[in-house]
């Protein structure tokens, strides 16, 4: 059953009033593939626009806080922790991991996914002048803790088709 639809099939924000406040956490990732020369420029600090990782990290943090403004049926949340980690992955990619936490009545999966996605888009924006062929891939939820549905770990779950 899709929880965002009412009995007539209309989009609706889920009522979480009676849900218990519990600790909730989610971790998401995104990967940006690029030319090795582009990655080298980022890692060496030689990008003319400045520190790509620092700007992407701040963009991801800001995005997590704005998720309910971007995704219509997401609840506005008082996140208690947002972390965005960026690192070179091989010689042609940046792997972004974003985690969000709160004590609340609804999960933070969308906030973590939004943080990872916007950090990836920020890397693309900052580097597009030197590498228009970059590819953003593997945006996914890695882990979710808390709430009624329990603990989810991506590599231990069946992939939806």
From Swiss-Prot:
InterPro entries in alphabetical order: MoaC (IPR023045), MoaC_bact/euk (IPR047594), MoaC_sf (IPR036522), MoCo_biosynth_MoaA/MoaC (IPR050105), Mopterin_CF_biosynth-C_dom (IPR002820)
Active site: 125
Keywords, sorted A to Z: Lyase, Molybdenum cofactor biosynthesis
Chemical reaction(s) catalysed: (8S)-3',8-cyclo-7,8-dihydroguanosine 5'-triphosphate = cyclic pyranopterin phosphate + diphosphate
Annotated residues for binding of substrate: 73-75, 110-111
Function of the molecule: Catalyzes the conversion of (8S)-3',8-cyclo-7,8-dihydroguanosine 5'-triphosphate to cyclic pyranopterin monophosphate (cPMP).
Entries under PANTHER family matching the protein: CYCLIC PYRANOPTERIN MONOPHOSPHATE SYNTHASE (PTHR22960:SF29), MOLYBDOPTERIN COFACTOR SYNTHESIS PROTEIN A (PTHR22960)
Subunit structure and binding partners: Homohexamer; trimer of dimers.
Protein name as annotated: Cyclic pyranopterin monophosphate synthase
Organism (species): Pseudomonas savastanoi pv. phaseolicola (strain 1448A / Race 6)
Lineage: Bacteria, Pseudomonadati, Pseudomonadota, Gammaproteobacteria, Pseudomonadales
Gene: moaC
């Amino acid at each position: 059953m899709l929880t965002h639809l009412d009995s007539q099939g209309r989009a609706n924000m889920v009522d979480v009033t009676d849900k218990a406040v519990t600790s909730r956490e989610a971790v998401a990732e995104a990967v940006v593939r690029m030319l090795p020369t582009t990655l080298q420029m980022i890692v060496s600090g030689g990008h003319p626009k400045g520190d790509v990782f620092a700007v992407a990290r701040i963009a991801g943090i800001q995005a997590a806080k704005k998720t309910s403004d971007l995704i219509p049926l997401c609840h506005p949340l008082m996140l208690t922790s947002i972390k965005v980690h960026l690192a070179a992955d091989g010689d042609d990619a940046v792997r972004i991991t974003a985690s969000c936490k709160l004590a609340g009545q609804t999960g933070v999966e969308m906030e973590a996914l939004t943080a990872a996605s916007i950090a990836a888009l920020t890397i693309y924006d900052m580097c597009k002048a030197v590498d228009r062929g970059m590819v953003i891939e593997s945006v996914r939820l890695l882990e979710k803790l808390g709430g009624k549905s329990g603990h989810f770990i991506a590599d231990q779950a069946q992939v939806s088709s």
